[in-house]
Amino acid sequence: MAALVTSQLATSGTVLSVTDRFRRPGFQGLRPRNPADAALGMRTVGASAAPKQSRKPHRFDRRCLSMVVRATGSGGMNLVFVGAEMAPWSKTGGLGDVLGGLPAAMAANGHRVMVISPRYDQYKDAWDTSVISEIKVVDRYERVRYFHCYKRGVDRVFVDHPCFLEKVRGKTKEKIYGPDAGTDYEDNQQRFSLLCQAALEVPRILDLNNNPHFSGPYAMLCRAVPRRAGEDVVFVCNDWHTGLLACYLKSNYQSNGIYRTAKVAFCIHNISYQGRFSFDDFAQLNLPDRFKSSFDFIDGYDKPVEGRKINWMKAGILQADKVLTVSPYYAEELISGEARGCELDNIMRLTGITGIVNGMDVSEWDPIKDKFLTVNYDVTTALEGKALNKEALQAEVGLPVDRKVPLVAFIGRLEEQKGPDVMIAAIPEIVKEEDVQIVLLGTGKKKFERLLKSVEEKFPTKVRAVVRFNAPLAHQMMAGADVLAVTSRFEPCGLIQLQGMRYGTPCACASTGGLVDTIVEGKTGFHMGRLSVDCNVVEPADVKKVVTTLKRAVKVVGTPAYHEMVKNCMIQDLSWKGPAKNWEDVLLELGVEGSEPGIVGEEIAPLALENVAAP
């Protein structure tokens, strides 16, 4: 059975803002004095005095006007994504990448899009809206502020509170969920309950169009299109941290006539992290007893407590109007049984689940203009370009420089899911029998970092292990490697194989999740077969699969068949454009009033139109 962790370590022409009926006497700052607030379990503080900004007002030229109108020319949908991570501001894995890339692609298709995430750092490009809410958490009220920036056609809203900002300093990495890999913060329930409630307030109280301290496209947008109430919203929740949002929406808002037509889509990025806590903790969530059954859960684990528990992800699945995940094959795996569904398979068979493969940021990962590469290349120059980058990579890590020697790369978080222990167990047999070099890059659990260094010590002329965060080296490895090894025990979608294909590097991968949907045997890579999901042991059969597949891949390197694979990898469209259209089709099925299909567009990201906070 897969090891289970209690907490993750691992536009339209409408405006989502204060409704017209709030524009009356009694308006307090950017927020009305609303009698319903008492029922919502929160208090309005309104807008505090904002610091003066010396920046000149934004001037719109014809180019700006045409951009804004084109982006909002269709009815579209009002989409509010909510998640614990949002790249590039915060990221530990694929969740951050999705909330960084998918919303921008949806906005490019004419939908009005907002993303809400915690403010873990003092982001230089996010300005203080001066809007404050007091939200009930357990038995007290907590004050939150909202910061905002407008990037790539998307409103990025950051929830500011000490429980986020004071715990994470500098690069976030795994510190979002705990001080170290494998360790959670004790107050994670309170932190993410706060996030869910704060997120529900944003479309109601954050009037970006009329804020005098904002200078950006919204000044033009509010004139170009009619204002509309923020009722017809689709909230897109992501992983267990947002599992409470649908519950709060129903109990605190819809029961009081607010967000009457709003719907919730819940996306599972990794079923292994479910938010399991003591059943007694339900009382701390301030939810009616009628929701208890959605949380009630009994498993065979003794952590965090033995016996009856609450399960945030279970509640998120049951209370959502639509359940999605990040690849079709992963959706099949989740309902296949207890082992891969992590004891929620029966729930997902009941609700149904839709899988949509992720895209990737094709501007950040682009061999044509990648600043980290020794030689840039495209599909027509890939063979020579990759050979030159291989030589540079070999020299960089201290391996013998020889472009004729096949080079295998492994890049990933050093945790059980990614199977670094399986990869390391396979290396001795591979390097003893094949003329090959292997470069390993990753950080994570100390036991795996030690394993990586130990295998380098055993094979100093054939293996290099880099156990520190090194983004430039990751790019160099993508370009210089002949084969990318992905030994994941399970992989909901996977980004690494998409990045590899973007650089013309075929992938030798385990046959699980999104790897099945994205890697085609013999055309863009090599399949190992499915590996065991038991994270506590390294199965000999799994080691054999890795050895056999990598040997097979190494023998193909340099042949005409391999050259064709490089080409096949590079000619694919791996952007968010296709996935965004699939997401649109699914979300339209929710039938939210006023929702319409979007347009076929390109991302809106001219730097001159992006809102950047004053220094």
UniProtKB/Swiss-Prot annotation:
One family name in Pfam for this protein: Glycos_transf_1
GO MF term list: alpha-1,4-glucan glucosyltransferase (UDP-glucose donor) activity
Annotated compartments: Plastid, Chloroplast; Plastid, Amyloplast
Reactions the enzyme catalyzes: an NDP-alpha-D-glucose + [(1->4)-alpha-D-glucosyl](n) = [(1->4)-alpha-D-glucosyl](n+1) + a ribonucleoside 5'-diphosphate + H(+)
GO biological process, one term: starch biosynthetic process
Positions of disulphide bridges: none
InterPro entries: Glyco_trans_1, GS/SS, Starch_synth_cat_dom
TM annotation in the entry: none
Xref: Gene3D superfamilies: Glycogen Phosphorylase B (3.40.50.2000)
Enzyme class label: transferase
Broad class of the protein's primary localization: plastid
Protein name as catalogued: Granule-bound starch synthase 1, chloroplastic/amyloplastic
Record lineage: Eukaryota, Viridiplantae, Streptophyta, Embryophyta, Tracheophyta
